Amino acid sequence: MLTFMASDSEEEVCDERTSLMSAESPTPRSCQDGRQGLEDGESAAQWRSQESEEDHEEEDPDRYVCSGVPGRPPGLEEELTLKYGAKHVIMLFVPVTLCMIVVVATIKSVRFYTEKNGQLIYTPFSEDTPSVGQRLLNSVLNTLIMISVIVTMTIFLVVLYKYRCYKFIHGWLIMSSLMLLFLFTYIYLGEVLKTYNVAMDYPTLFLTVWNFGAVGMVCIHWKGPLVLQQAYLIMISALMALVFIKYLPEWSAWVILGAISVYDLVAVLCPKGPLRMLVETAQERNEPIFPALIYSSAMVWTVGMAKLDPSSQGALQLPYDPEMEEDSYDSFGEPSYPDVFEPPLPGYPGEELEEEEERGVKLGLGDFIFYSVLVGKAAATGSGDWNTTLACFVAILIGLCLTLLLLAVFKKALPALPISITFGLIFYFSTDNLVRPFMDTLASHQLYI
Protein backbone atom coordinates (compact mmCIF):
# COMPACT_ATOMS: atom_id res chain seq x y z
CA MET A 1 0.00 0.00 0.00
CA LEU A 2 1.39 3.38 -1.02
CA THR A 3 0.08 6.70 0.23
CA PHE A 4 1.10 10.31 0.67
CA MET A 5 2.04 11.42 4.15
CA ALA A 6 0.13 14.67 3.79
CA SER A 7 -2.45 16.38 5.95
CA ASP A 8 -5.88 14.85 6.23
CA SER A 9 -7.78 17.99 5.24
CA GLU A 10 -7.08 20.79 2.85
CA GLU A 11 -7.28 23.35 5.63
CA GLU A 12 -4.38 21.82 7.55
CA VAL A 13 -0.77 22.74 7.16
CA CYS A 14 0.83 20.86 4.29
CA ASP A 15 4.10 22.58 3.40
CA GLU A 16 7.38 20.99 4.39
CA ARG A 17 8.90 24.27 5.61
CA THR A 18 6.03 25.25 7.87
CA SER A 19 6.33 25.21 11.64
CA LEU A 20 5.04 27.07 14.65
CA MET A 21 7.48 29.59 16.07
CA SER A 22 8.42 29.40 19.72
CA ALA A 23 8.80 32.44 21.89
CA GLU A 24 12.60 32.23 21.79
CA SER A 25 12.80 32.78 18.02
CA PRO A 26 12.42 36.25 16.51
CA THR A 27 8.82 36.78 15.54
CA PRO A 28 8.26 37.42 11.83
CA ARG A 29 6.65 40.66 10.88
CA SER A 30 2.96 40.55 10.09
CA CYS A 31 0.58 43.08 8.62
CA GLN A 32 -0.50 44.13 12.11
CA ASP A 33 3.12 44.92 12.96
CA GLY A 34 3.32 47.07 9.88
CA ARG A 35 0.26 49.10 10.80
CA GLN A 36 1.58 49.55 14.32
CA GLY A 37 4.84 50.76 12.87
CA LEU A 38 3.00 53.45 10.90
CA GLU A 39 1.18 54.55 14.03
CA ASP A 40 4.47 54.80 15.94
CA GLY A 41 5.87 57.18 13.39
CA GLU A 42 7.48 54.95 10.84
CA SER A 43 7.91 56.59 7.48
CA ALA A 44 4.95 55.99 5.17
CA ALA A 45 7.20 56.28 2.13
CA GLN A 46 9.47 53.63 3.55
CA TRP A 47 6.49 51.31 4.13
CA ARG A 48 5.16 51.89 0.60
CA SER A 49 8.59 51.22 -0.86
CA GLN A 50 8.82 48.02 1.14
CA GLU A 51 5.38 46.91 -0.06
CA SER A 52 6.30 47.75 -3.67
CA GLU A 53 9.42 45.61 -3.48
CA GLU A 54 7.44 42.72 -2.08
CA ASP A 55 4.73 43.07 -4.75
CA HIS A 56 7.26 42.92 -7.57
CA GLU A 57 9.18 40.12 -5.99
CA GLU A 58 9.06 36.82 -7.86
CA GLU A 59 6.53 34.39 -6.41
CA ASP A 60 8.17 31.68 -4.36
CA PRO A 61 6.04 28.54 -3.83
CA ASP A 62 7.78 27.85 -0.53
CA ARG A 63 6.31 31.05 0.91
CA TYR A 64 2.78 29.71 0.62
CA VAL A 65 2.23 27.61 3.66
CA CYS A 66 -1.25 26.18 3.25
CA SER A 67 -3.23 24.82 0.34
CA GLY A 68 -6.23 26.83 -0.62
CA VAL A 69 -5.09 30.14 0.87
CA PRO A 70 -5.58 33.36 -1.11
CA GLY A 71 -2.59 34.31 -3.18
CA ARG A 72 -1.49 30.84 -4.31
CA PRO A 73 -0.08 31.34 -7.82
CA PRO A 74 -1.67 29.34 -10.65
CA GLY A 75 0.08 26.12 -11.50
CA LEU A 76 1.62 25.71 -8.05
CA GLU A 77 -0.12 22.37 -7.53
CA GLU A 78 1.42 21.05 -10.74
CA GLU A 79 4.86 22.30 -9.69
CA LEU A 80 4.53 20.66 -6.28
CA THR A 81 3.37 17.43 -7.92
CA LEU A 82 6.45 17.36 -10.17
CA LYS A 83 8.78 18.37 -7.35
CA TYR A 84 7.52 15.89 -4.81
CA GLY A 85 6.94 13.20 -7.43
CA ALA A 86 10.61 13.11 -8.44
CA LYS A 87 11.71 13.44 -4.83
CA HIS A 88 9.51 10.57 -3.70
CA VAL A 89 10.75 8.31 -6.49
CA ILE A 90 14.30 8.70 -5.19
CA MET A 91 13.23 8.44 -1.55
CA LEU A 92 11.57 5.06 -2.22
CA PHE A 93 13.99 3.69 -4.83
CA VAL A 94 16.85 3.74 -2.32
CA PRO A 95 15.22 1.65 0.47
CA VAL A 96 13.57 -0.78 -1.96
CA THR A 97 16.89 -1.24 -3.75
CA LEU A 98 18.77 -1.76 -0.49
CA CYS A 99 16.26 -4.35 0.70
CA MET A 100 16.50 -6.32 -2.55
CA ILE A 101 20.30 -6.08 -2.56
CA VAL A 102 20.48 -7.54 0.96
CA VAL A 103 18.22 -10.42 -0.07
CA VAL A 104 20.01 -11.18 -3.35
CA ALA A 105 23.46 -10.95 -1.76
CA THR A 106 22.37 -13.37 0.96
CA ILE A 107 20.82 -15.79 -1.54
CA LYS A 108 23.96 -15.80 -3.69
CA SER A 109 26.36 -16.30 -0.78
CA VAL A 110 24.56 -18.13 2.06
CA ARG A 111 23.48 -21.61 0.99
CA PHE A 112 21.18 -22.03 4.01
CA TYR A 113 18.41 -19.93 2.44
CA THR A 114 18.35 -21.94 -0.80
CA GLU A 115 18.23 -25.38 0.83
CA LYS A 116 14.76 -26.94 0.83
CA ASN A 117 14.47 -28.77 4.14
CA GLY A 118 11.00 -27.74 5.28
CA GLN A 119 7.82 -25.83 4.55
CA LEU A 120 5.68 -23.27 6.32
CA ILE A 121 2.66 -24.47 8.23
CA TYR A 122 0.56 -22.30 5.89
CA THR A 123 1.71 -24.31 2.85
CA PRO A 124 1.10 -27.94 3.92
CA PHE A 125 0.87 -29.46 0.42
CA SER A 126 4.17 -30.74 -0.93
CA GLU A 127 5.30 -30.15 -4.51
CA ASP A 128 7.67 -33.12 -4.60
CA THR A 129 5.60 -35.02 -7.14
CA PRO A 130 6.36 -35.98 -10.76
CA SER A 131 2.87 -35.08 -11.94
CA VAL A 132 2.64 -31.52 -13.25
CA GLY A 133 -1.11 -31.38 -12.66
CA GLN A 134 -0.79 -32.51 -9.05
CA ARG A 135 2.02 -30.03 -8.48
CA LEU A 136 -0.07 -27.21 -9.91
CA LEU A 137 -3.05 -28.22 -7.79
CA ASN A 138 -0.94 -28.32 -4.64
CA SER A 139 0.48 -24.87 -5.38
CA VAL A 140 -3.04 -23.46 -5.85
CA LEU A 141 -4.19 -25.03 -2.58
CA ASN A 142 -1.16 -23.63 -0.77
CA THR A 143 -1.94 -20.22 -2.23
CA LEU A 144 -5.56 -20.35 -1.09
CA ILE A 145 -4.50 -21.21 2.45
CA MET A 146 -1.82 -18.49 2.52
CA ILE A 147 -4.13 -15.78 1.16
CA SER A 148 -6.87 -16.84 3.58
CA VAL A 149 -4.48 -16.43 6.50
CA ILE A 150 -3.39 -13.00 5.25
CA VAL A 151 -6.99 -11.84 4.75
CA THR A 152 -8.03 -13.12 8.18
CA MET A 153 -5.13 -11.45 9.96
CA THR A 154 -5.71 -8.17 8.10
CA ILE A 155 -9.41 -8.09 8.97
CA PHE A 156 -8.57 -8.96 12.58
CA LEU A 157 -6.11 -6.05 12.70
CA VAL A 158 -8.65 -3.63 11.21
CA VAL A 159 -11.32 -4.70 13.72
CA LEU A 160 -8.89 -4.22 16.61
CA TYR A 161 -7.94 -0.78 15.31
CA LYS A 162 -11.55 0.24 14.72
CA TYR A 163 -12.47 -0.61 18.31
CA ARG A 164 -9.33 1.12 19.63
CA CYS A 165 -7.62 -1.98 20.99
CA TYR A 166 -4.30 -0.20 20.72
CA LYS A 167 -2.58 -2.07 23.55
CA PHE A 168 -3.35 -5.43 21.98
CA ILE A 169 -2.07 -4.24 18.58
CA HIS A 170 1.10 -2.82 20.14
CA GLY A 171 1.68 -6.09 21.98
CA TRP A 172 1.15 -8.06 18.78
CA LEU A 173 3.59 -5.87 16.84
CA ILE A 174 6.13 -5.89 19.66
CA MET A 175 6.12 -9.69 19.78
CA SER A 176 6.59 -9.85 16.00
CA SER A 177 9.44 -7.34 16.15
CA LEU A 178 11.09 -9.24 19.02
CA MET A 179 11.05 -12.46 17.00
CA LEU A 180 12.45 -10.77 13.90
CA LEU A 181 15.10 -8.67 15.62
CA PHE A 182 16.36 -11.36 17.98
CA LEU A 183 15.55 -14.89 16.77
CA PHE A 184 15.75 -14.35 13.01
CA THR A 185 18.77 -12.08 13.39
CA TYR A 186 20.52 -14.75 15.48
CA ILE A 187 19.85 -17.38 12.80
CA TYR A 188 20.92 -15.03 9.99
CA LEU A 189 24.12 -13.93 11.70
CA GLY A 190 25.02 -17.51 12.59
CA GLU A 191 24.62 -18.68 8.98
CA VAL A 192 26.61 -15.73 7.62
CA LEU A 193 29.47 -16.39 10.06
CA LYS A 194 29.40 -20.09 9.18
CA THR A 195 29.46 -19.34 5.44
CA TYR A 196 32.48 -17.03 5.66
CA ASN A 197 34.18 -19.23 8.30
CA VAL A 198 34.36 -16.47 10.90
CA ALA A 199 34.79 -17.64 14.48
CA MET A 200 32.82 -15.88 17.22
CA ASP A 201 32.22 -16.95 20.80
CA TYR A 202 28.66 -17.19 22.09
CA PRO A 203 28.88 -14.30 24.62
CA THR A 204 30.00 -11.93 21.87
CA LEU A 205 27.30 -13.24 19.54
CA PHE A 206 24.57 -12.84 22.16
CA LEU A 207 25.79 -9.35 23.05
CA THR A 208 25.79 -8.32 19.38
CA VAL A 209 22.29 -9.66 18.81
CA TRP A 210 21.06 -8.07 22.05
CA ASN A 211 22.43 -4.63 21.12
CA PHE A 212 21.04 -4.88 17.59
CA GLY A 213 17.60 -5.97 18.76
CA ALA A 214 17.32 -3.56 21.68
CA VAL A 215 18.21 -0.53 19.58
CA GLY A 216 15.79 -1.70 16.90
CA MET A 217 12.92 -2.06 19.36
CA VAL A 218 13.53 1.46 20.68
CA CYS A 219 13.78 3.02 17.21
CA ILE A 220 10.72 1.26 15.79
CA HIS A 221 8.32 1.38 18.73
CA TRP A 222 9.46 4.49 20.60
CA LYS A 223 11.92 7.17 19.53
CA GLY A 224 15.01 7.24 17.39
CA PRO A 225 16.67 8.87 14.38
CA LEU A 226 14.61 8.55 11.22
CA VAL A 227 17.49 7.05 9.23
CA LEU A 228 18.08 4.40 11.90
CA GLN A 229 14.39 3.52 12.02
CA GLN A 230 14.32 3.19 8.24
CA ALA A 231 17.41 0.95 8.31
CA TYR A 232 15.80 -1.38 10.84
CA LEU A 233 12.56 -1.57 8.85
CA ILE A 234 14.54 -2.46 5.73
CA MET A 235 16.45 -5.13 7.64
CA ILE A 236 13.40 -6.83 9.16
CA SER A 237 11.73 -6.78 5.74
CA ALA A 238 14.76 -8.52 4.25
CA LEU A 239 14.79 -11.12 7.06
CA MET A 240 11.10 -11.87 6.55
CA ALA A 241 11.60 -12.15 2.79
CA LEU A 242 14.45 -14.62 3.32
CA VAL A 243 12.19 -16.81 5.47
CA PHE A 244 9.56 -16.86 2.72
CA ILE A 245 12.17 -17.65 0.07
CA LYS A 246 13.52 -20.58 2.08
CA TYR A 247 10.24 -22.18 3.16
CA LEU A 248 7.83 -21.43 0.29
CA PRO A 249 7.72 -24.12 -2.44
CA GLU A 250 8.80 -22.88 -5.84
CA TRP A 251 5.51 -23.02 -7.72
CA SER A 252 3.52 -21.92 -4.69
CA ALA A 253 5.73 -18.84 -4.36
CA TRP A 254 4.96 -17.66 -7.90
CA VAL A 255 1.23 -18.31 -7.55
CA ILE A 256 1.18 -16.55 -4.17
CA LEU A 257 2.92 -13.51 -5.67
CA GLY A 258 0.27 -13.25 -8.37
CA ALA A 259 -2.58 -13.77 -5.91
CA ILE A 260 -1.25 -11.29 -3.34
CA SER A 261 -1.07 -8.55 -5.97
CA VAL A 262 -4.74 -9.14 -6.85
CA TYR A 263 -5.67 -9.13 -3.16
CA ASP A 264 -3.73 -5.89 -2.62
CA LEU A 265 -5.69 -4.29 -5.46
CA VAL A 266 -9.01 -5.33 -3.92
CA ALA A 267 -8.06 -4.52 -0.32
CA VAL A 268 -6.96 -0.95 -1.09
CA LEU A 269 -9.37 0.16 -3.83
CA CYS A 270 -12.65 -1.53 -2.87
CA PRO A 271 -14.93 0.64 -0.68
CA LYS A 272 -15.03 -2.06 2.00
CA GLY A 273 -11.48 -3.29 1.50
CA PRO A 274 -9.68 -3.89 4.82
CA LEU A 275 -6.61 -1.80 4.00
CA ARG A 276 -8.76 1.06 2.73
CA MET A 277 -10.86 0.95 5.90
CA LEU A 278 -7.66 1.02 7.98
CA VAL A 279 -6.34 4.10 6.16
CA GLU A 280 -9.69 5.91 6.28
CA THR A 281 -10.10 5.19 9.99
CA ALA A 282 -6.61 6.53 10.69
CA GLN A 283 -7.39 9.67 8.67
CA GLU A 284 -10.69 10.23 10.45
CA ARG A 285 -8.95 10.01 13.82
CA ASN A 286 -5.98 12.04 12.57
CA GLU A 287 -3.62 9.30 13.78
CA PRO A 288 -0.50 7.88 12.12
CA ILE A 289 -0.50 4.20 11.24
CA PHE A 290 1.76 2.08 13.42
CA PRO A 291 5.43 2.56 12.39
CA ALA A 292 6.08 -1.19 12.62
CA LEU A 293 3.76 -1.67 9.62
CA ILE A 294 4.73 1.30 7.46
CA TYR A 295 7.96 2.63 5.99
CA SER A 296 7.86 6.44 6.04
CA SER A 297 10.14 8.40 3.73
CA ALA A 298 9.98 11.44 6.02
CA MET A 299 9.40 12.17 9.68
CA VAL A 300 5.70 11.84 10.36
CA TRP A 301 5.11 13.94 13.45
CA THR A 302 7.16 16.19 15.68
CA VAL A 303 5.90 17.07 19.13
CA GLY A 304 7.06 20.16 20.98
CA MET A 305 6.05 22.73 23.55
CA ALA A 306 5.20 26.06 21.95
CA LYS A 307 4.92 29.20 24.06
CA LEU A 308 2.60 31.39 22.07
CA ASP A 309 2.07 35.06 22.65
CA PRO A 310 -1.66 35.71 23.29
CA SER A 311 -1.64 38.56 20.79
CA SER A 312 -0.35 36.29 18.03
CA GLN A 313 -2.34 33.16 18.77
CA GLY A 314 -3.57 31.52 15.60
CA ALA A 315 -0.88 33.06 13.39
CA LEU A 316 0.81 30.49 11.19
CA GLN A 317 4.38 31.53 10.50
CA LEU A 318 7.46 30.40 8.66
CA PRO A 319 10.43 29.13 10.67
CA TYR A 320 13.22 31.45 11.66
CA ASP A 321 16.32 31.05 9.51
CA PRO A 322 19.55 32.87 10.51
CA GLU A 323 20.78 32.86 6.90
CA MET A 324 17.63 34.61 5.74
CA GLU A 325 18.18 37.34 8.32
CA GLU A 326 21.45 38.41 6.70
CA ASP A 327 19.85 38.89 3.28
CA SER A 328 16.46 40.18 4.37
CA TYR A 329 17.22 43.89 4.80
CA ASP A 330 15.67 46.34 2.39
CA SER A 331 17.26 49.48 0.98
CA PHE A 332 16.23 51.53 4.03
CA GLY A 333 18.05 49.28 6.48
CA GLU A 334 14.88 47.70 7.88
CA PRO A 335 14.42 43.93 7.82
CA SER A 336 11.77 42.60 5.46
CA TYR A 337 9.86 39.48 6.44
CA PRO A 338 8.01 36.82 4.49
CA ASP A 339 4.26 36.86 4.23
CA VAL A 340 2.23 35.67 7.20
CA PHE A 341 -1.18 34.06 6.78
CA GLU A 342 -3.60 33.71 9.66
CA PRO A 343 -5.95 30.75 9.25
CA PRO A 344 -8.21 29.96 12.19
CA LEU A 345 -5.82 27.80 14.21
CA PRO A 346 -6.52 28.18 17.92
CA GLY A 347 -3.57 27.93 20.27
CA TYR A 348 -2.88 28.29 23.94
CA PRO A 349 0.30 29.10 25.85
CA GLY A 350 2.22 25.97 26.83
CA GLU A 351 0.03 23.74 24.68
CA GLU A 352 1.65 20.61 23.24
CA LEU A 353 1.42 20.98 19.48
CA GLU A 354 1.79 18.42 16.77
CA GLU A 355 2.87 19.45 13.33
CA GLU A 356 3.74 17.80 10.11
CA GLU A 357 7.41 18.37 9.47
CA GLU A 358 7.86 17.16 5.95
CA ARG A 359 5.76 15.77 3.18
CA GLY A 360 6.55 12.21 2.28
CA VAL A 361 5.17 8.89 1.18
CA LYS A 362 4.42 5.71 3.09
CA LEU A 363 5.06 2.23 1.75
CA GLY A 364 3.86 -0.84 3.60
CA LEU A 365 6.48 -3.28 4.80
CA GLY A 366 4.56 -6.05 3.04
CA ASP A 367 5.43 -4.40 -0.26
CA PHE A 368 9.14 -4.49 0.63
CA ILE A 369 8.81 -8.15 1.59
CA PHE A 370 7.08 -9.35 -1.58
CA TYR A 371 9.34 -7.25 -3.85
CA SER A 372 12.32 -8.97 -2.24
CA VAL A 373 10.65 -12.40 -2.41
CA LEU A 374 10.22 -12.01 -6.17
CA VAL A 375 13.82 -10.96 -6.77
CA GLY A 376 15.16 -13.51 -4.29
CA LYS A 377 13.19 -16.36 -5.87
CA ALA A 378 14.49 -15.29 -9.28
CA ALA A 379 18.03 -15.50 -7.90
CA ALA A 380 17.48 -18.81 -6.08
CA THR A 381 15.30 -20.92 -8.38
CA GLY A 382 15.69 -22.18 -11.93
CA SER A 383 18.86 -21.08 -13.60
CA GLY A 384 19.43 -18.30 -11.09
CA ASP A 385 21.46 -16.30 -13.61
CA TRP A 386 22.03 -12.59 -13.24
CA ASN A 387 20.06 -11.67 -16.36
CA THR A 388 16.82 -12.93 -14.81
CA THR A 389 17.59 -11.35 -11.43
CA LEU A 390 18.40 -7.96 -12.93
CA ALA A 391 15.33 -8.11 -15.16
CA CYS A 392 13.09 -8.63 -12.11
CA PHE A 393 14.90 -5.86 -10.26
CA VAL A 394 14.36 -3.38 -13.09
CA ALA A 395 10.74 -4.47 -13.50
CA ILE A 396 9.96 -3.79 -9.85
CA LEU A 397 11.52 -0.32 -9.98
CA ILE A 398 9.60 0.51 -13.17
CA GLY A 399 6.36 -0.61 -11.55
CA LEU A 400 7.10 1.42 -8.42
CA CYS A 401 7.80 4.49 -10.55
CA LEU A 402 4.47 4.10 -12.37
CA THR A 403 2.66 3.61 -9.06
CA LEU A 404 4.19 6.82 -7.69
CA LEU A 405 3.11 8.61 -10.86
CA LEU A 406 -0.46 7.42 -10.35
CA LEU A 407 -0.23 8.44 -6.70
CA ALA A 408 0.72 11.98 -7.70
CA VAL A 409 -2.23 12.10 -10.12
CA PHE A 410 -4.98 10.59 -7.97
CA LYS A 411 -3.66 11.78 -4.56
CA LYS A 412 -5.08 8.87 -2.59
CA ALA A 413 -3.84 5.57 -1.20
CA LEU A 414 -2.95 3.12 -3.97
CA PRO A 415 -1.80 -0.52 -3.94
CA ALA A 416 1.93 -0.78 -4.57
CA LEU A 417 2.08 -4.47 -5.47
CA PRO A 418 -0.03 -5.01 -8.64
CA ILE A 419 2.02 -3.09 -11.21
CA SER A 420 5.44 -4.05 -9.85
CA ILE A 421 4.61 -7.72 -9.26
CA THR A 422 2.93 -8.03 -12.68
CA PHE A 423 5.96 -6.55 -14.41
CA GLY A 424 8.26 -8.72 -12.31
CA LEU A 425 6.44 -11.94 -13.19
CA ILE A 426 6.34 -11.05 -16.90
CA PHE A 427 10.03 -10.13 -16.94
CA TYR A 428 10.99 -13.26 -14.98
CA PHE A 429 9.24 -15.82 -17.18
CA SER A 430 10.11 -14.06 -20.44
CA THR A 431 13.77 -13.70 -19.48
CA ASP A 432 14.06 -17.21 -18.07
CA ASN A 433 12.38 -18.88 -21.05
CA LEU A 434 13.41 -16.62 -23.95
CA VAL A 435 16.40 -14.41 -23.17
CA ARG A 436 18.45 -16.93 -21.17
CA PRO A 437 18.29 -19.74 -23.80
CA PHE A 438 19.14 -17.19 -26.48
CA MET A 439 22.17 -15.96 -24.52
CA ASP A 440 23.27 -19.54 -23.80
CA THR A 441 23.08 -20.40 -27.50
CA LEU A 442 25.14 -17.35 -28.41
CA ALA A 443 27.73 -18.22 -25.78
CA SER A 444 27.95 -21.86 -26.90
CA HIS A 445 28.61 -20.77 -30.49
CA GLN A 446 30.98 -18.01 -29.31
CA LEU A 447 28.90 -15.28 -30.89
CA TYR A 448 28.85 -11.87 -29.24
CA ILE A 449 26.47 -9.01 -29.93
Curated annotation (Swiss-Prot):
Its EC number is 3.4.23.-. Its main location: endoplasmic reticulum. It is found in: Endoplasmic reticulum membrane; Golgi apparatus membrane. One of its GO terms (cellular component) is centrosome. Phosphorylated on serine residues. One of its GO terms (biological process) is protein processing. A motif (PAL) lies at residues 415-417. The keyword Oxidoreductase does not apply. Pfam families: Presenilin. It is an enzyme of class 3 (hydrolase). One of its GO terms (molecular function) is aspartic endopeptidase activity, intramembrane cleaving. It is a multi-pass membrane protein. Residues 1-88, 161-167, 223-224, 272-362, 411-414, 436-449 are cytoplasmic. The active site is at residues 264, 367. The chain crosses the membrane at residues 89-109, 140-160, 168-188, 202-222, 225-245, 251-271, 363-383, 390-410. The PAL motif is required for normal active site conformation. Belongs to the peptidase A22A family. Homodimer. Component of the gamma-secretase complex, a complex composed of a presenilin homodimer (PSEN1 or PSEN2), nicastrin (NCSTN), APH1 (APH1A or APH1B) and PEN2. Such minimal complex is sufficient for secretase activity, although other components may exist. Interacts with DOCK3. Interacts with HERPUD1, FLNA and FLNB. Probable catalytic subunit of the gamma-secretase complex, an endoprotease complex that catalyzes the intramembrane cleavage of integral membrane proteins such as Notch receptors and APP (amyloid-beta precursor protein). Requires the other members of the gamma-secretase complex to have a protease activity. May play a role in intracellular signaling and gene expression or in linking chromatin to the nuclear membrane. May function in the cytoplasmic partitioning of proteins. This is Presenilin-2. The gene is PSEN2.
